[in-house]
Amino acid sequence: MTTVSPRPRMARRALDGVLLLDKPVGLSSNDALMRAKRLYQAKKAGHTGTLDPLASGLLPLCFGEATKFSQDLLEADKTYEATMRLGVRTTTGDAEGDVLDTRDVSCDEAAVRAALARFVGEIVQVPPMYSALKRDGKPLYEYARAGQTVEREGRTVTIRALALVSCALPDVTFRVTCSKGTYVRTLAEDIGEALGCGAHLTMLRRTGVGPLTLEHAVTLDALDAATQDERDARLAPVDALLSTFPCVKLDAALATRFLHGQRLKLSELAARPDAAEGGRVRVYDADDRLLGVARASEGVLAPERLVVTGA
């Protein structure tokens, strides 16, 4: 009897960096993460907030030490390009849902532009029933699938910018930059109601997360076809997540103290960081290796998160 030896497990690699992935429609964020993690044979990886399966676009993936800073992207503003169809409301607020009602579309482009302008700034959104937001420990979409509607409190979000991209009625494409927690489906529905005809979302593509943009992203198919060296070259450094923070450079002695978690007096530094009181700062050694992030407060630089490898 012939025995078949089990295939040896491929060794996992300790990678540090950020992959800007262009997620396709139809794939969940977790599935995209696992595919990328397998391709890179990475020991540790995580994403920076889910992107709905029906949405495409920028999904930053963090490897190794970069996972320590993924929360910063969770909190960051997001930019999307979206298309809505006026005159039709659906159960889910997008093209996957059943049609609730249809109405005539009597507005013109000028009315659309005026409606968009009304939604810039702080607005209150009622989260959609088809969402992962939980009520009594249960996702809202589970109630919705059971035919139940539960009361949801409105939440304040901020629309930083909202611009018309194209208007081919009944289809309207817009670009929006918004704070975390914004539901673009709900935004489309609310714009439709403001126009008196209702609307649902037919396309959603994320083009920006904080300082990161889609133009530098790569698809899973391209990664699959690439060599390992080519894949590795696509990884951005850990500090790509932190580019909006001011920075400070430490000499060897101060760097050693910082990496041991010691607080440093700002007066000890060769140059003070250009940070507001209580602001966060990127910290580097004399060779421009990232040591971590600190908070500058009351004349002291206090370590907040350390990068073990100096990636």
UniProtKB/Swiss-Prot annotation:
Its EC number is 5.4.99.25. Gene3D superfamilies: Pseudouridine synthase, PUA domain. Coiled coil: none annotated. Responsible for synthesis of pseudouridine from uracil-55 in the psi GC loop of transfer RNAs. GO terms for biological process: mRNA pseudouridine synthesis; tRNA pseudouridine synthesis. It catalyses: uridine(55) in tRNA = pseudouridine(55) in tRNA. Keywords: Isomerase, tRNA processing. It is an enzyme of class 5 (isomerase). This is tRNA pseudouridine synthase B. CDD domains: PseudoU_synth_EcTruB, PUA_TruB_bacterial. The active site is at D52. GO terms for molecular function: RNA binding; tRNA pseudouridine(55) synthase activity. It comes from the Bacteria. InterPro entries: PsdUridine_synth_cat_dom_sf, PsdUridine_synth_N, PUA-like_sf, PUA_sf, tRNA_psdUridine_synth_TruB, tRNA_sdUridine_synth_fam1_C, TruB_C. Belongs to the pseudouridine synthase TruB family. Type 1 subfamily.
